[in-house]
């Protein structure tokens, strides 16, 4: 009994000494550069659209197009992730999305801006491959930390870049910012060219002669069983509830995401440089909160950690709208960065529920649901904002509160063995699995 206990202790990853593979660090480096380029323009972008004559509803249309393009990319992205070399899929899709700032530069109205953002969001075709690659490359039992490191890389890249973008905009004009973004996007794509082969893919190839296959490399075509395809995923009740609860929260967030900077400009009379500074504060919050959520995910469970983080987001959002104090606004913006912090870690929840059945299709289905329900969110938010500045924020807070609470409940059930991947072990016919 003692020997068995000691063996289990040796197998369990030490929370204070988690090994982060080289592949994860390279993904984080690429995400840092991409995040820097994205942060240069993202917070000023809605205000820039207003400056070229777009109405709040038209700004909403642009962001709705973004969500539609993201949704359209999910299923093909899942197929690509499971049929082809994930490293090549990641590299090619990043290169495809890099030129999008050029279209922002050329935009004279919301139409060209919508084309540009469709190109950017369509390049998320490679996101299922990136998530599946990260899941298969992560140290066993530390997927929360791995996804956290990747998301922190992106968030850290966005900390200083909004300030830089605001300064560049004031000195050389907002269009120059888009050229800077292009340069950083291309640099980030170059980093992706150095990704190593997947560790679990190599293991599955070695085991193929004996008739075994690694679950994390499973899927369509050459990758074998895995999730059992989209039909198998749709029959997994815990996974479907997880998708539904988080999708409600995503809809609410993307409904108000383009409104935050507009609210600062319209209601708080903030300048472009001030909006960039406040965007930096949100990015700092995203980076620091990601570390907290990732650590909590590995200790308490991803679904519970993400759900609890969403409840903190709700309180911050309400205070942001209801309390006009500059000091409170600063604190709230820092905490509002927590939504994207949780979104960077939530993909580890796919592995927590499905375990080694989590393949490219599983990540694609999760992204598809989240993006599809969010398509009309930005447009609805813009239409409501044109009539009442506070209404979309109150609605978003209510939806996230419900979704976050239900996620906490679902996560507790998963950890206690009443649902998700743990319960799946009790169901005959499902492949045996271990925690990612």
Segments and roles (model prediction):
Residues 303-343:
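C-terminal transmembrane helical hairpin of 12-TM major facilitator-type secondary transporters
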Residues 74-85, 169, 290-301, 385:
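Helix-to-loop junctions at the C-terminal end of transmembrane segments
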Residues 88-102, 182, 304-318:
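Structural signature of the two symmetry-related core transmembrane helices
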Residues 17-67, 240-241, 245, 250-268:
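Helix-loop boundary and gating motifs at the non-cytosolic
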Residues 67-75, 125, 158-159, 283-291, ...:
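Residue-level signature of mid-helix packing/kink "hotspots" within the transmembrane helices
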Residues 32, 111-125, 328-341:
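Hydrophobic core of transmembrane alpha-helices in multi-pass small-molecule transporters
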Residues 118-154:
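Cytoplasmic helix-loop-helix junction between adjacent transmembrane helices
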Residues 3-21, 198-242, 425-432, 436:
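Juxtamembrane intracellular "pre-TM" segments in multi-pass secondary transporters
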